[in-house]
Curated annotation (Swiss-Prot):
UniProt keyword list: Ribonucleoprotein, Ribosomal protein
Similarity comment: family membership: Belongs to the universal ribosomal protein uL30 family.
Entry GO MF terms: structural constituent of ribosome
CDD domains attached to this UniProt entry: Ribosomal_L30
Pfam families (alphabetical): Ribosomal_L30
Protein name: Large ribosomal subunit protein uL30
One Gene Ontology cellular component annotation held by this UniProt entry: cytosolic large ribosomal subunit
Family matches, as SUPFAM superfamilies: Ribosomal protein L30p/L7e
InterPro entries: Ribo_uL30_ferredoxin-like_sf, Ribosomal_uL30_bac-type, Ribosomal_uL30_CS, Ribosomal_uL30_ferredoxin-like
Length: 59
């Protein structure tokens, strides 16, 4: 079974770069305190790294 990680949005996407807003949508995050469980892949890790100031990650 693939390893999963939980990603929670902790900061607002208002007044952020459009690229960062798109990254949050790509991760499936819609609002503050919204949590999604994702498969741990290099692509997902790269997306998380890009918006690390807006999300919290639990392994």
């Amino acid at each position: 079974m693939a390893k999963t990680i939980k990603v929670t949005q902790v900061r607002s996407s208002i007044a952020r770069l459009p690229k960062h807003k798109a990254t949050l949508r790509g991760l499936g995050l819609r609002r503050i305190n919204h949590t999604v469980e994702l498969i741990d892949t290099p692509a997902i890790r790269g997306m998380i790294n890009q918006v690390s100031y807006m999300v919290k990650v639990e392994e």
